[in-house]
Amino acid sequence: MKMEDLFSLLPWLRDVPVQNQFSLDDKMYSDALKLFTESKSILSNNVSPIGSTTPEELERYMFAFILYASKRLGAKTTGDASEGSNQSGITLCQKLKAVKLNLVDFFKELPQFVVKIGPILSDMYGADWEKRLEAKELQANFVHLSLLSKYYKRAYQEFFKTNEVDKEVADPGTSSSDSISDYYRFGWLLFLALRVHAFSRFKDLVTCTNGIVSVLAILIIHIPARLRKFSALDLPLFEKKIDRGVNLVASLCQKYDTSEDEVKHMMEKANELILEILKKNPCSASLCKTENLENIDPDDLTYFEDLLEDSSLPNCISMLEKDYDAAIWNKGDIDERVFVNVDDSLLGSGSLSGGAINISGLREIRCNGLFNETIASPLSPCRSPALHVNGARGGVNIRMISTPVSTAMTTAKWLRTYISPLPSKPSPQLEKYLMSCDRNISSEVVRRAHIIMEAIFPNSALGERCIAGSLPNSNLTDNIWAQQRRLEALKLYYRVLETMCTAEAQLLHANNLTSLLTNERFHRCMLACSAELVLATHKTVTMLFPAVLEKTGITAFDLSKVIESFIRHEDSLPRELRRHLNSLEERLLESMAWEKGSSMDNSLIIARPALSAGINRFGLLAEPMPFLNAMAAHIEVSTGGLPPLPSSCKHEFAAGQNGDIRSPKRACTEYRSVLVERNSFTSPVKDRLINNLKQKLTPPALQSAFASPTRLSPGGGGETCAETGINIFFSKIVKLAAVRINGMIERLEKLEKQSQTQQLREQLRENVYCRFHIILNQRTSLFFNRHIDQIILCAFYGVAKISQYELTFKEIILNYRKQPQCKPQVFRSVFVDWSFSRRNRQGQDHVDIITFYNEVFIPSVKPLLGELGPQGACVKTDLIPESNNDKDGQCPGSPKLSTFPSLPDMSPKKVAKNVYVSPLRSSKMDALISNSSKSYYACVGESTHAFQSPSKDLTAINDRLNSTSKVRGALNFDTDAGLVSDSLVANSLYLQNGNCATTSSVGPLKTEQPDS
């Protein structure tokens, strides 16, 4: 294929400096031309009146995506980097620069093209094209590198000067802060070498952060001392000291919440790379006499002569550049060196993932999420109160902005501190529950857990080829990583399973939990939830959700059955992991439960038989869970030491507990958690009253959740478990919709005209909510394969037209863009099946929100919207001018609906005598509460114990408030009272200067570790 073929399609491409024809061979060019030609009609339909993108801009985005897809999907899957080494590669960054795009904008549009061109890619490259394309992994990798580069920059600037480090003088118009230090660039290149060679498969955020800290340690002992901003005697920076000097690695790990063992391991890998790539000879630091090692303990440190001297630094950088070029030359991935370049215009600005991840590096908290009430509280601080042996607080007591990297490291510290020390087998108490079933199921539980964890965290195959350029033992490193993650997830699974069993046993007043503990789906959900939390802690790029669902054979709807119970039965679970589970449940409610293959549909055909035809027509039913033995046969699982599967268990796995495996139509349904009705914060007395009441009225939560959907609900009323579960599930969706509708109304208020009254705004909110509620119950099929926000947006416009509210669809979309959950594909790509529409079209497609509104939404819900107007007189005005439709039949009677649900406000809430809950963030609470009265408050995210809910302190607070003893008594100078030491006085003075300290003779102060 010639370039003229592309020039004829894209005239603007003639002005693009084409380097080696974008590194595509003839077949790739042919595929690219075919892909672009077949996608051109889709491209023309993509120009929507609600967007501002010009046709040429869309062509540039599509051309960049097609280049990336053709290169990624058309590349050979065999061979190594030596094949075709005579060709010149081109990175994704170079392609985007050629077509005048940046990375952030490219990744924002990437999901749109994946959906639009997906069917064409499937025909050209096979059904597994999306897995091979690795678009989600590439985007997550970009976000992680953006965060890591800023993390590295902050750390470097804290230790080293950023000016007067290069021989060349910067241009007069360039500030010193804009110049890039050669030492700074060397550190980033060494980190990239670690990423390429040492941990090539699992590039998770925690492992990468450990790598950055190891590189920082190498820089500290090699960068000339004249460029330091610190002294080795500085207490805030280097807290770990011994007689021979500062323990460098331990001090850095203390400061950055990293694992000392992992950082030492990374330093060994980095030293190997310096030896192999830079050809520098290592020597023991204890044998070297250099200014850089003064006051630093040299034990276990390696020093390289002339590594970062002025004479050798340029050559070292050049060699690292060549090594990186060789590693990425033909992959078409991101050139990760762009993150430390002076000109970062290629990076772009803004946020990805609907605002959940911000490229600026600062965490954005979605304050208007659904589950602010249903979760008892954020149970752990972002930073745990690590203390010295003598009680002195480590570091400077300054509340710093939490970043995604520092938060991930704090969460990883929770795994090391609370989960890793646990046994990797059932505890004696859990064994008691397993043995108390109708038969002893201990061996079955252990074997299942082993197989599932091996499926989620597999070892590298023995014959698996190492990635080109990797160190010889990189597969061994990957296997060690997988083994560590398996153990963490396994220990967490056993821990939470025990607490759940204890709660169920107390509720039933019996230890026989056969119905629950013999349910295969329940255990897989628990294992998947544990593994997902471990993956979320490490921010693993190659195992993004819903990977754990695919590995375990369950669906997102199944996982939702244990999310609430999992959170409530693990008190030490950090705040970020609770938010992660809540976000997963929100994703389930808004879209994943409505996708093809969701087990919710298996319950819907029982709870709502009228929907069975539509569910079968769209092929939505979930596939059966794979057999456990079949999963074991497809993974390399070592069963040494594990008992064989009993015959009774084999029969159960074949038949499936409650028909789970054999018949997908009898899938388990949603459940009502024992504690779901609890307030966000309650007093211990109220807790006991609620628990006593629910023990009498509420059936066992988990057992009923995983019961057969055709079984009558234990709650009575003649409902089946499927009906009860669907009703509860729909109520959660309605609540989520109410939160989002309210957010839209609040943002619309800023744009309204003065003539429109508050009453009209309230009426709009009420009507949109009521219409959504009715549509969910009477037009449920509109939600299949769609996002609930698409229905909300259409309901907004339809109600606005009926109510003669001056609001255009463009204004609705512009305000929706400001919502924290906004994703462009929600209003750009809406699923439609033309086979069942009135138009003479066939097949399935994705259209913009306006086309969906006119062609599908209005014909279905027009009678429901007409109820708002006088005798349905406004039916003709509810269409966008692009099309008109005939009237439907009369609308069936709608049930009387409750008013718009009350949402949490920002006023302090009294939850018990003398106890109020304030919504203020802890940073504002600190400014309002004096030090002397802090012990009377439980602040959100803080507690007297690390990773514990503040609600656990309410008993102590009540006792303190209701105590008759005087709080302030006379000073006791008795001999057994203990004297105030000089160190306490010194530490108290140190506290006044912005630091905090405690002593063993006084109760520890509530402190918070500073972020990095």
From Swiss-Prot:
Q: Where is this region: Spacer?
A: 605-723
Pfam families, from UniProt? Answer: DUF3452 (PF11934), RB_A (PF01858), RB_B (PF01857)
PANTHER family attached here?
RE32990P-RELATED, RETINOBLASTOMA-ASSOCIATED PROTEIN RB -RELATED
Task: List the GO cellular component terms.
Answer: chromatin; nucleus; transcription regulator complex
- Region (Domain B) location: 724-863
Protein name, please? Retinoblastoma-related protein
Which SUPFAM superfamilies does the record associate with it? Cyclin-like (SSF47954)
**UniProt gene name:** RB
Localization recorded for this chain is: Nucleus
Keywords, sorted A to Z: Cell cycle, Nucleus, Repressor, Transcription, Transcription regulation
